[in-house]
């Protein structure tokens, strides 16, 4: 199925489910949880402390572990094949169960694309209150199934837990050539940074939970969160990039800092080049900021220098993203071609937002 047909299939499925819910109980999923999406994740500083007592594992075939907080593990099977192993799950960011399934699966699959691979097999991770209409859960699972189908992988079951707070996601196994693995620790001086989705999903989702976001913006953020990074990553087959990650729970600056620290470089960010979702700036100015943004700030603030950046813009840069875009480090001479290829393959956005320079006093400088 080509890209146009996949997009049409997605629209038809979404419209069909909006008119035929297949469950009786009225439910607002976002009202059943304390925090939505990646904003519900434990903060990076808290996690780092928890992992201090866990020794790093070394193996000649473990190409990527967790030493650089990378997006997934990569294990070499032979000279031609390596497996990408990842999982992700979170609480609802929308009230529609089917859309929640689509969004969560999109987010879970993203790590495989960030590592330069293709997903093969996925399994469901489900937490759901058994007292609720089973049709609601069925629609969540249907959304996940449809998005996995779009990715080209297959969904083969999973595991569930009875839980008052609904949560959904996937464990995913992907494949990549050992010589084509991408990591978040290989950015080179002279590279530029390309971002493939606008920022603001955490702030917008917080506004949605509060009922203060317009429908047009709701539709836009759902479109962004259900768009697979598969399409941007197709360009990696044509143009070799040095480093990549996806922008998710640790926010744009959190993931940028991890790339800079892992690569032992400094990354300069040009704020004027970064796209924001509609209403994001207005909500940030009004203080509609998820708690995760403050946790992200606390974790990386000593490694980031802001130069004349307004407070509300800073908040957006720390905002935890749900199913965010790819952040790619590519040689400057190849950057325009990469952007053009990404857009041609169907990426929602792709633009140059920064550059890699020799290591300075901070890992990230924002201007």
UniProtKB/Swiss-Prot annotation:
Pfam families in UniProt: AIRS, AIRS_C
Listed GO MF terms: ATP binding; magnesium ion binding; selenide, water dikinase activity
Cellular component aspect of the GO annotation: cytoplasm
Active site: 38
Site, Important for catalytic activity: residue positions: 41
Cofactor comment text: Binds 1 Mg(2+) ion per monomer.
Record's keyword terms, sorted: ATP-binding, Kinase, Magnesium, Metal-binding, Nucleotide-binding, Selenium, Selenocysteine, Transferase
Amino acids binding Mg(2+): 71, 111, 246
EC main group: transferase
Obligatory cofactor(s): Mg(2+)
Positions that bind ATP: 41, 68-70, 88, 111, 158-160
Catalytic reaction(s) noted: hydrogenselenide + ATP + H2O = selenophosphate + AMP + phosphate + 2 H(+)
InterPro entries linked: PurM-like_C_dom, PurM-like_C_sf, PurM-like_N, PurM-like_N_sf, SelD_I, SPS/SelD
Entry superkingdom: Bacteria
GO biological process, one term: selenocysteine biosynthetic process
E.C. code: 2.7.9.3
Function: Synthesizes selenophosphate from selenide and ATP.
HAMAP family in the cross-refs: SelD
Family classification: Belongs to the selenophosphate synthase 1 family. Class I subfamily.
Quaternary structure (record): Homodimer.
Protein name: Selenide, water dikinase 1
Encoding gene per record: selD1
């Amino acid at each position: 199925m080509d890209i146009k047909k996949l997009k049409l299939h997605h629209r038809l499925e979404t419209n069909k489910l909006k008119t035929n819910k297949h469950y009786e109980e009225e439910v607002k999923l976002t009202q059943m949880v304390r925090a939505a999406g990646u904003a519900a994740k434990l903060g990076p500083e808290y996690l780092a402390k928890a992992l201090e007592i866990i020794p790093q594992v070394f193996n000649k075939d473990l190409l990527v572990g967790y030493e650089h907080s990378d997006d997934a593990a990569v294990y070499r099977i032979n000279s031609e094949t390596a497996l990408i192993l990842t999982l992700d799950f979170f609480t609802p960011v929308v009230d529609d169960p089917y859309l929640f399934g689509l969004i969560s699966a999109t987010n879970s699959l993203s790590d495989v694309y960030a590592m330069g691979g293709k997903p093969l097999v996925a399994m469901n991770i489900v937490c759901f209150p058994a007292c609720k209409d089973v049709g609601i859960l069925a629609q969540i699972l249907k959304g996940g199934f449809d998005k996995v189908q779009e990715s080209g992988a297959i969904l083969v079951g999973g595991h569930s837990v009875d839980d008052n707070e609904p949560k959904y996601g996937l464990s995913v196994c992907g494949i990549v050539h050992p010589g084509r693995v991408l990591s978040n620790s290989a950015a080179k001086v002279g590279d530029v940074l390309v971002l493939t989705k606008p920022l603001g999903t955490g702030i917008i989702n917080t506004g949605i939970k509060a009922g203060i976001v317009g429908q047009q913006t709701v539709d836009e953020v759902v479109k962004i969160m259900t768009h697979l990074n598969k399409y941007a990553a197709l360009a990696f087959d044509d143009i070799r990039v040095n480093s990549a990650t996806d922008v998710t729970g640790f926010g744009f600056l959190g993931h940028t800092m991890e790339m800079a620290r892992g690569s032992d470089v400094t990354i300069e960010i040009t704020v004027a080049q970064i796209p924001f979702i509609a209403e994001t700036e207005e909500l940030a100015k009004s203080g509609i900021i998820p708690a995760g943004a403050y946790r992200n700030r606390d974790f990386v603030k000593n490694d980031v220098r802001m130069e004349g950046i307004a407070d509300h813009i800073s908040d957006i840069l720390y905002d935890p993203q749900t199913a965010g875009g790819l952040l790619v480090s590519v040689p400057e001479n190849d950057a325009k071609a990469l952007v053009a290829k990404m857009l041609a393959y169907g990426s929602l956005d792709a633009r140059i937002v920064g550059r890699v320079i020799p290591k300075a006093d901070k890992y990230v400088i924002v201007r």
